[in-house]
Each structure stands twice: as C-alpha cells, then as structure tokens.
Design a protein with these regions (language model features):
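Local sequence-structure signature of Cys/Sec-based thiol-disulfide redox active-site neighborhoods
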Residues: 1-25
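Short alpha-helical
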Residues: 11, 36-37, 61
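Residue-level recognition of oxygen-bearing side chains
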Residues: 15, 37, 65
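Short polybasic/polar patches that bind polyanions
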Residues: 21, 28, 43
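Conserved beta-strand scaffold positions in the cores of enzyme catalytic domains, especially
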Residues: 27-29, 59
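Thioredoxin-like thiol-disulfide oxidoreductase module
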Residues: 31-48, 72
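Structural micro-motif
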Residues: 45-53, 63-64
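Non-catalytic, surface beta->alpha helical segment in thiol-disulfide oxidoreductase systems
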Residues: 55-74
Length: 74
C-alpha cells in the first residue's frame, strides 16, 4: 500500500496518483494542510516539498523517485 501526502494544488501529487492507478497499485492520499500532525511531521523531517510518498513504512520521496521506484521494480 502506498501513501501519498500532498496538497490539493500539487500537480505532482496528481501525477503520482495517476501513476499508481495506471500500475494497479493501491494508495491512499492525505492533504497535509488538513492535519496538524502531518504538518509537524513534515517540519520535523525537513520535508519542504510535496508529495512525500511511502510504500508501507518505507519513505520513497517525491514523484520522480516514485516513478523510478516503480519502473525499477524495487
């Protein structure tokens, strides 16, 4: 299961969702601006961009890293 943390105005978040859907991979999406805990998590980890994507508990990174991760079959 993939987890996408982003914002409603994030084009790369939409591209990440499309990529996962086109590869029949399950995901959930959460808007970080709606959850103070996620805002704090972003600050604590120094993440300044969205999306931040995980597969289960493994942090993948942004859209480009997700694309590479899927194409290489990691």
């Amino acid at each position: 299961m993939f987890y996408i943390y982003g914002t409603s105005s994030c084009g790369f978040c939409d591209r990440a969702k499309d990529l996962l859907e086109s590869n029949n991979l399950e995901y959930t999406y959460q808007d970080v601006t709606m959850d103070q805990g996620l805002i704090d998590l972003f600050k604590m980890n120094g993440w300044k961009t969205v999306p931040q994507i995980f597969e289960d508990e493994k942090h993948i990174g942004g859209f480009d890293k997700l694309k590479k991760y899927i194409m290489e079959g990691d």
